[in-house]
């Protein structure tokens, strides 16, 4: 699934339609926003990515220059990768684990410039770090 911030919202719509139609895959790969939003495909949480993006898009912690000035990141890491999925709009780790679909998050190795693929298996802390 493609990265690219708001392009990811298009991906969310496609994912939701595929889930509603019962379309499944043996595996999926997401990069950047595609990984962050695409993990909801494996956890089978239809509408979740769109829902929390709509709900928190005006919250400076979700993404803003104010967040960048305060934290050094455009997206407040604690808010986006811990508070939302753990408390505000809970990510279903059990469904993620139970789904046999293989899911990889891809990132760029800053030393070699090559793609590094991480197999996300349980939606726990290490997987979340790769998604961000």
Q: Which sequence ranges carry the predicted segments?
A:
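Internal, conserved structured core segments that host functional sites
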Residues: 100-115, 121
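Patatin-like phospholipase
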Residues: 2-87, 117-132
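Short, solvent-exposed coil/turn linker segments
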Residues: 63-64, 95, 113
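Glycine-rich, flexible loop/turn motifs
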Residues: 92, 114, 131
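A short alpha-helix-loop-beta-strand transition element characteristic
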Residues: 88-102
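Preference for short coil/turn "hinge" residues that link or interrupt alpha-helices
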Residues: 16-18, 89, 103, 111
């Amino acid at each position: 699934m493609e990265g690219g911030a708001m392009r990811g919202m298009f991906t969310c719509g496609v994912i939701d339609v595929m889930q509603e139609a019962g379309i499944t895959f043996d595996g999926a790969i997401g990069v950047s926003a595609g990984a962050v939003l695409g993990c909801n495909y494996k956890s089978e949480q239809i509408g979740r990515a769109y829902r929390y993006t709509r709900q928190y898009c005006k919250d400076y912690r979700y993404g803003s220059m104010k967040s960048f000035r305060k934290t050094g990141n455009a997206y407040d890491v604690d808010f986006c990768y811990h508070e939302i999925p753990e408390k505000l709009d809970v990510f279903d780790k059990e469904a993620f684990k139970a789904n046999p679909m293989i899911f990889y998050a891809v990132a760029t190795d800053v030393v070699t410039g090559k793609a590094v693929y991480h197999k996300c298996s349980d939606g726990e802390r290490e997987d979340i770090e790769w998604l961000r």
